[in-house]
Amino acid sequence: MKNIGLLLKKERKRKGMTQQQLANLIPGLTRSSISKYESSENIPHYNMDKFIEVLKSPRLKLAVNGTVIKSPLLDNVDLSPLATQQKMLEELKETMDSLKKLNLINKLNTQDLDENEREFILQDVLIQICDLDTCSSLFMASIIENFNFDIAEIEKQEINKMKRKGYLSRGRY
């Protein structure tokens, strides 16, 4: 995992924590081990899971797991290319409709939201995006399996595209 230590440091600082404060929240870790992890790429997965949990960091989770929310492999749906394409179009429309209703003008953090806005974001926007994420993963799996595309090649092309556009500055993360 390239630059994961740097991301860990950024996320710890974003939460306003010192290395010692973070170490105090994770049994078995010390300030010096946190320092070592932040300057390295070798962080054991079990510790990474603890960092994600304690820091409640969607960025770390995305960097480590490739997703913020895990998408289940649904086993009671039609996974044919046409069925998944149609479901994808339906989920895209529902997500677009939810996003169009979302007003984020002058909304930068949780203090800027009232309870109704928080509930709307959770129930109507984030849950809908989870549905779309699951659907898009199943659609991709269906297309890749049925039409014999190479997953590694798709990932490589996507990473290269993100680098060309300037969205990735160094390495993968």
Regions found by a protein language model. Name each.
Residues 1-13:
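A short, Lys/Arg-rich alpha-helix, primarily the initiator
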Residues 16-33:
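Short alpha-helical DNA-recognition segment
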Residues 46-62:
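DNA major-groove recognition helix of helix-turn-helix/homeodomain DNA-binding modules
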Residues 26, 37-38, 55:
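DNA major-groove recognition helix of helix-turn-helix
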Residues 7, 18-19, 44-47:
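Residues that mark the N-terminal boundary/hinge immediately upstream of a DNA-recognition element
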Residues 68-134, 141:
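Helix-turn-helix/homeodomain-like alpha-helical modules used for DNA recognition
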Residues 64-87, 154-173:
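Short, charged recognition helix plus adjacent turn
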